[in-house]
Amino acid sequence: MKNLLIICDNFPPQSGPRMGYLVKYAKRLGWNSYVVAAENKSRNDLTGLSGYAVETYVVPQRRHRKWNLLHILHFFWPYDYLRGEYEIRRIASEIVQRVKIDLVLCTHTYGWFPLSAAYAVAKKANIPLIVDIRDLVEQNPKIPFFEMSFNQKMDFLRDKCSFLSNRRAVRMHRDAAALTSISPWHAEWLKRWNRNSFCIYNGFDPELFKPIEPVKSNQFEIVYAGSLATKRQRNPELLLEAIVQLDRSGVISPEMFTLNFYGEPSGSHVLPAARALGIERYLKFFPSVPITNLPEIFAKASVLLLLGARPSDFRTHGVMTTKFYEYFASRRPILLVPDDEECLGQVIRESGAGWAVRTVEDTVSCLTTLLEQWKATGVVSGNTMDGDRYDLFSRETQASQFVEIFDKILNGTMVPGQIFNGTDKIEGD
């Protein structure tokens, strides 16, 4: 067995499914994992991913006043003392001294924490470092400063002020043996820092989400599961306007057509928009349900809904919501409204998983076709993608792709500049 040291900003059971599934499935592929993670107070229940690492250490974050001296200095300095980066480094160094670690893997989002600790440990012990970047500042739209929230303004100022941190972070990414990220857009962007940049998608739990036989229903049910965030991020206008047209033309009625939201019982920004159009009777809102109950809900759905943002309103890059993978696993048809005109819409179209629509007319046409099929058979048929395409997005495949990169690094057969986009294999020299 080879040994992997993971240094991360969160880890199950609180959060961090990407690393949690890697640890679980990499063990089956010959890799033991040692984990040093920062404390995360998220309420996610990922207890099913606990216990697979050989050792797991959770470093608590320090309590502090929001604007004490350390907090202000963090604007300019790369070490995140407030989140326990020194303690993470100390524990990781102790592990390296008593265990033969083959690779160090650091995963981070905005702010690069805890990359400094991982870089220092790997460099001192002369161990290859892999950096997994889950988010980049550059993926977000450029919002005028006066339109930013207070927290966004603070993040913007910190990014401008912390030039020492920024320069050092670029060097650490360049020195890494490889970079990985969550979408082809991210991997391509990261080539500016490191030619060995690879896309490894997130995915679904193959032991929980499996192909589902559709259940006949006397109602055409569109299901949305998850947070509605803000209107700029989850814009329902195209779908609601399409429902207005179908209602006025007599194609649908509340008795045979419903749009159900799970996770936002208040209706968030969607319910007021529906009321303004006079179609609130078609919508129902429910509280969040345990993840284990989702497959049953998906089985009863005619269509699974993903809400995106109009590119002109909120131009994000490379965002692949985890909800897509759970929908994808069920093989129920997916409707993305509106098309993000990027990675998510492209994957949905190319995989045959569903539809990504850009106009009200497209939405009406799509729903009309699906309604005709439902009226004739009582169900809407799912996608018929081949097994290889389906397996591409499982967490088990994700782990095997990580392990393939690990082995290439240790064997010295990595091809500089090649992008692993999830469909092509990494070839040796």
Protein language model regions, located:
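Membrane-proximal helix-turn-helix segments that form the acceptor-binding/catalytic region
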Residues: 113, 120-124, 137-139, 152-179
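Carbohydrate-associated surface elements
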Residues: 182-185, 203
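N-terminal subdomain of nucleotide-sugar transferases
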Residues: 1-60, 178, 413-415, 420, ...
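Conserved donor-binding/catalytic core segment of Leloir-type glycosyltransferases
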Residues: 215-236, 240-241, 398
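Acidic anion/phosphate-binding donor-loop and adjacent secondary structure
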Residues: 204-219
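Acidic donor-binding loop of glycosyltransferase active sites
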Residues: 177, 298-317
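Nucleotide-activated donor-binding/catalytic signature segment of Leloir-type glycosyltransferases, i.e.
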Residues: 256-257, 263, 268-295
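A charged, aromatic-enriched C-terminal amphipathic alpha-helix characteristic of glycosyltransferases
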Residues: 358-364, 375-411
